Amino acid sequence: WSSDVCSSDLNLFLELAQQWHDAFAADNVTKILTIEASGIAIAAAAGMSMGVPVLFAKKHKTSNVDGGVYSTVVHSFTHGEDYHVVVSRDYLSCDDCVLLVDDFLANGAALAGLCDLVEQSGATIVGAGIAVEKCFQPGGQRLRERGLRIDSLAMVKSMGDDGSIE
């Protein structure tokens, strides 16, 4: 583990956060929502940049989540299983304007699940900030067709068997 690597990662996260701060400045974002676990770091940076709380949907209800929850099922293509994703009703209300944040967008199941959670709460989805979108997979197109505004900061057209990325 190197502090130089950690510092570089944090600087990148802060740059991503600033891009989303600028892109969604007029949308009165009140909360940021991501899904555990890989999106948490960039969502936290975005929350700091925007000065708003960050929520993360848990992949299953745990004993430290009291009371009612909003829940949905999200299929993980990476792990080949379904997760019952939850967020506490205490933290998301119809008065919120929510920015969804995640590190990758591929098939779109995680992002669609986050949309479902926000819709259950009656809150407004202002859009999604995505670090890397795999454009050769259908998630981004499907979600845009549903009307979701997506701000992807890197868009990958293809990945070759030889490791090449376009």
Model-derived features: where do they sit?
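A short, well-structured juxtamembrane/interface segment
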Residues: D9-V29
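Short, glycine/charge-rich flexible loops or terminal/linker lids adjacent to PRPP-binding catalytic cores
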Residues: V52-V98, S164-E166
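Short Gly/Thr/Asp-enriched flexible loops that form oxyanion-binding sites at enzyme active sites
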Residues: A41-M50, C115
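Short glycine-rich phosphate-binding loop at a beta-alpha junction
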Residues: V29-E36
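Conserved acidic residues
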Residues: T30, D96, V126
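Short, small-residue-biased leader/transition segments that mark boundaries at the very start
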Residues: W1-S7
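PRPP-dependent phosphoribosyltransferase catalytic core
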Residues: G113-E166
